[in-house]
């Protein structure tokens, strides 16, 4: 069984660099055909999940990520803002839902959340979920306790990107380690949340680094449920402002290989989309991208406006995905209840969500 066939039929966590590089080296049409075949085996090919991203705390970040205009180390003209008030966040969430978004993502330019801000963060999660939307946050590094509190508040997804390969990482960021990022992802998993993790291409990395990034993501104990693939947005004042553009076909290849390696994950066409023409975006959807950020801004960088996105969707026959009417936990509880009701004898089944008499509590 070759790498492509294995990727189409199984979730693998043992990819080698040689296998990933072999996928990247496929003729372009063959690669897209393989990616689309895998995509159709796991998803409706004409449905795209739509998220809205809001910066709830902007700028003055102490980290030194060379691509980021929110770093306090670079002079980008970005005005720092304090944590947004909860009601203002809810106003934006209501607008996002009305415009067709099923998930609301909230990002804060922090190294890690401070204790004084946690009550407001937790309330944002609870209130946005109350609107019937999925929730996602990106707040920097987390402790195990912080992850547990976010999970208990009902956070659906936590975003924490690996950014690039372990080998190239030190050329881009020095203020936190690759292992720091992996630790945060482990805490998120341990708290029962879904993982959103991807990276940025076009930062001057080599082809083997794009392969290494996808290998690091696919070889996690569980694949991220959402894998954002970002094209570098070059911002004046950052160290990467004059970086050469990545070949568009190489970006599309990265989308396709991500789809093959992580067949059941949503692959998000993320930052940099504002610079892509409609034909390139359509090819990304053909390559297996099935999620986008919707709205005129991603944190602090431009994004196509809502009308142009919906017009493109209409021309391509693409539908925005709808959120499941009931959360996974509710569906699971109802299924268990139905199984228990129909079982004979009833003692053969029990509701795993309820403690059993005499059972030890964890």
Curated annotation (Swiss-Prot):
PANTHER family: BIOTIN SYNTHASE, BIOTIN SYNTHASE, MITOCHONDRIAL. Keywords: 2Fe-2S, 4Fe-4S, Biotin biosynthesis, Iron, Iron-sulfur, Metal-binding, S-adenosyl-L-methionine, Transferase. Residues 320-339 are annotated as: Disordered. InterPro entries: Aldolase_TIM, BATS_dom, Biotin_synth/BioAB, Biotin_synthase, Elp3/MiaA/NifB-like_rSAM, rSAM. The lineage of its organism: Bacteria, Pseudomonadati, Pseudomonadota, Gammaproteobacteria, Aeromonadales. Coiled coil: none annotated. Its cofactor is [4Fe-4S] cluster; [2Fe-2S] cluster. It comes from the Bacteria. Its EC number is 2.8.1.6. [4Fe-4S] cluster binds at residues 61, 65, 68. Catalyzes the conversion of dethiobiotin (DTB) to biotin by the insertion of a sulfur atom into dethiobiotin via a radical-based mechanism. The keyword Iron applies. Homodimer. It comes from Aeromonas hydrophila subsp. hydrophila (strain ATCC 7966 / DSM 30187 / BCRC 13018 / CCUG 14551 / JCM 1027 / KCTC 2358 / NCIMB 9240 / NCTC 8049). Belongs to the radical SAM superfamily. Biotin synthase family. SUPFAM superfamilies: Radical SAM enzymes (SSF102114). The keyword Nucleotide-binding does not apply. Residues 46-273 form the Radical SAM core domain. This is Biotin synthase. GO terms for molecular function: 2 iron, 2 sulfur cluster binding; 4 iron, 4 sulfur cluster binding; biotin synthase activity; iron ion binding. Binds 1 [4Fe-4S] cluster. The cluster is coordinated with 3 cysteines and an exchangeable S-adenosyl-L-methionine. Binds 1 [2Fe-2S] cluster. The cluster is coordinated with 3 cysteines and 1 arginine. Pathway: Cofactor biosynthesis; biotin biosynthesis; biotin from 7,8-diaminononanoate: step 2/2. GO terms for biological process: biotin biosynthetic process. [2Fe-2S] cluster binds at residues 105, 136, 196, 268.
């Amino acid at each position: 069984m070759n790498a492509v066939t294995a990727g189409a039929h199984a979730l693998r966590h043992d990819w080698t660099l040689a296998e990933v590089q072999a996928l990247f080296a496929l003729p372009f049409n063959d690669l897209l055909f393989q990616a689309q075949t895998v995509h159709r085996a796991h998803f409706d090919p004409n449905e795209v999940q739509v998220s809205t991203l809001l910066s709830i705390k902007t700028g003055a970040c102490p980290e030194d990520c060379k691509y980021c205009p929110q770093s306090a180390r670079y002079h980008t003209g970005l005005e720092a803002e304090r944590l947004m008030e909860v009601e203002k966040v809810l106003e934006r969430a209501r607008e996002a839902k009305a415009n067709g978004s099923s998930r609301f993502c909230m990002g804060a330019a922090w190294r890690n959340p401070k204790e004084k801000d946690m009550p407001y963060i937790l309330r944002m999660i609870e209130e946005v979920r109350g609107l019937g939307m999925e929730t996602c946050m990106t707040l920097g590094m987390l402790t195990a306790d912080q992850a547990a509190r976010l999970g208990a508040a009902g956070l659906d997804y936590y975003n924490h990107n690996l950014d690039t390969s372990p080998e190239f990482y030190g050329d881009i960021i020095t203020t936190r380690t690759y292992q720091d990022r992996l630790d945060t992802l482990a805490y998120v998993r341990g708290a029962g949340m879904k993982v959103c993790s991807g990276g940025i291409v076009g930062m001057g990395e080599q082809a083997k680094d794009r392969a290494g990034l996808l290998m690091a993501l696919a070889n996690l104990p569980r694949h991220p449920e959402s894998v954002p693939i970002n094209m570098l947005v070059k911002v004046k004042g950052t160290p990467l402002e004059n970086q050469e553009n990545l070949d568009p076909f190489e970006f599309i290849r990265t989308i396709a290989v991500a789809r093959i390696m992580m067949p059941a994950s949503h692959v998000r066409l993320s930052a940099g989309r504002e610079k892509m023409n409609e034909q390139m975006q359509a090819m990304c959807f053909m390559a297996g991208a099935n999620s986008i950020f919707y709205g005129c801004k991603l944190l602090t960088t431009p994004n196509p406006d809502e009308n142009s996105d919906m017009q493109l969707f209409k021309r391509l026959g693409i539908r925005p995905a709808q959120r499941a009417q009931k959360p996974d936990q509710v569906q699971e509880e109802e299924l268990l209840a139905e199984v228990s009701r129909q079982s004979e004898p009833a003692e053969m089944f029990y509701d795993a969500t309820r403690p059993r008499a005499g059972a030890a509590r964890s």
